[in-house]
């Protein structure tokens, strides 16, 4: 049976992650409070931030930026939006 959590991002009961997605306290907090659906949304947003801001993931500053954005996305006032990003038109 799937583990259920009250997702802090979607504000509903949903299937939880199978394991903490990050090491440390932030990973544990995400595992306890974030659903698979919300995590998938973050992965798409994270990819957009990496691509639009041309982040080099070998750079420790870029990784630290993404960790801060992860925390803001789920537990703060929302993550940054990529400058100049225009979402595709709805079909």
Swiss-Prot record:
One of its GO terms (biological process) is cellular response to oxidative stress. GO terms for molecular function: iron ion binding. The keyword Iron applies. GO terms for cellular component: cytosol. SUPFAM superfamilies: YggX-like. Keywords: Iron. The keyword Transferase does not apply. Belongs to the Fe(2+)-trafficking protein family. Could be a mediator in iron transactions between iron acquisition and iron-requiring processes, such as synthesis and/or repair of Fe-S clusters in biosynthetic enzymes. This is Probable Fe(2+)-trafficking protein. It comes from Cupriavidus metallidurans (strain ATCC 43123 / DSM 2839 / NBRC 102507 / CH34).
């Amino acid at each position: 049976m799937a583990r259920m959590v009250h997702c802090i991002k979607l504000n509903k009961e949903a299937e939880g992650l199978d394991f903490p997605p990050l090491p440390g306290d932030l990973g544990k907090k995400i595992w306890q409070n974030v659903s698979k659906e919300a995590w998938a949304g973050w992965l798409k947003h994270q990819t957009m931030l990496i691509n639009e801001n041309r982040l080099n993931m070998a750079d420790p500053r870029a990784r630290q930026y993404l960790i801060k954005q992860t925390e803001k996305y789920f537990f703060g006032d929302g993550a940054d939006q990529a400058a100049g990003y225009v979402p595709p038109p709805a079909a």
